[in-house]
């Protein structure tokens, strides 16, 4: 039996490959990385260049294997064994695996694959092996799609491998919307852009005619909320990712709107509205235009973020005299403070898993990205810098991306990622200064 699932945006198709004599235990093999907060030794793995089934696939076969290896190595949980150490040379996707050769170089996981290309159509097949158990880890899979989507296919392979070995969801086949910046610090031009999670395939969504801030994906990834100063004052806008059609939301004379974020239903938007010197949190139904005020306080209340089930909102407020984090029911109600440490807290964002809240903290002249439980317990600071701010969660809720900016006139903003243990801090490779990242859900 073959199972197909069409992936409309990129024209990808997924199929199961059913090899002969796959052990029943292969679905639940012993190979497993247990993700904890302690120090771990990265799991050694090998990804030989995929087999090119025809001449037109040679370059793609090499490039796909490199992207897969980079995805896994970049997590800090895996360590690639370089090709120069390989004993076996994989020349056929269907050839038996020489487990002894891979054990000899201590490869605990092995990914093999093949690529065929015909015109604009590319087909990639792959299998994941638990080397020390002498068996496949799950069924083989096949992805098919256009040549322009080859990186997505590679990311999908890496997602499957990551998920099977760690038991956690992957996050490689995703995109990040961000603000691309240019010019001096005191006169920066800013425009919206999107990229693959690893910094590849940058595409610009707006020009630099007006300042844009705080983009946020919808739960389905097909729309983006953002704040623009196109009228001279901050206002929130909604953009369709496919057509780039844009419309204003919550427009009302004499007000400023900013810090928008979608509810999990994809229809409701929470945001801040400033009027007459007072800033409160509101919601807006993007279909009907119905607006509702959730807070009513003389303090500044902003940066709302929904819990994954949509029942609660975390936000920042200075109602206690300093900038702190609070949680309230999604329909409004009495908030409860969850941040209790020294310093100022802001930009809270709820993990897609629902277990943690990430935030920015300013304390003793330093900025930090941190996480805490939803009741405020177990606060952990993951980074420290002159300026770290604005965390966003990967789809699996185990990695954060944020903005880091250096001191002085020459300090340019850049995007960094870190896992929730604080171990794997990395700069996202971009050729332009960048800020305000927001991760998409996994692509369909």
Swiss-Prot record:
It comes from the Bacteria. The Tol-Pal system is composed of five core proteins: the inner membrane proteins TolA, TolQ and TolR, the periplasmic protein TolB and the outer membrane protein Pal. They form a network linking the inner and outer membranes and the peptidoglycan layer. Residues 1-26 form the signal peptide. One of its GO terms (cellular component) is periplasmic space. GO terms for biological process: cell division; protein import. SUPFAM superfamilies: TolB, N-terminal domain (SSF52964), Tricorn protease N-terminal domain (SSF69304). Residues 281-311 are annotated as: Disordered. It comes from Cereibacter sphaeroides (strain ATCC 17023 / DSM 158 / JCM 6121 / CCUG 31486 / LMG 2827 / NBRC 12203 / NCIMB 8253 / ATH 2.4.1.) (Rhodobacter sphaeroides). The keyword Zinc does not apply. Part of the Tol-Pal system, which plays a role in outer membrane invagination during cell division and is important for maintaining outer membrane integrity. This is Tol-Pal system protein TolB. Residues 281-310 have a biased composition (Polar residues). Disulfide bonds: none annotated. Keywords: Cell cycle, Cell division, Periplasm, Signal. It is found in: Periplasm. Belongs to the TolB family. The lineage of its organism: Bacteria, Pseudomonadati, Pseudomonadota, Alphaproteobacteria, Rhodobacterales. Pfam families: PD40 (PF07676), TolB_N (PF04052). Its main location: periplasm. InterPro entries: 6-blade_b-propeller_TolB-like (IPR011042), PD40 (IPR011659), Tol-Pal_TolB (IPR014167), TolB_N (IPR007195). NCBIfam families: propeller_TolB.
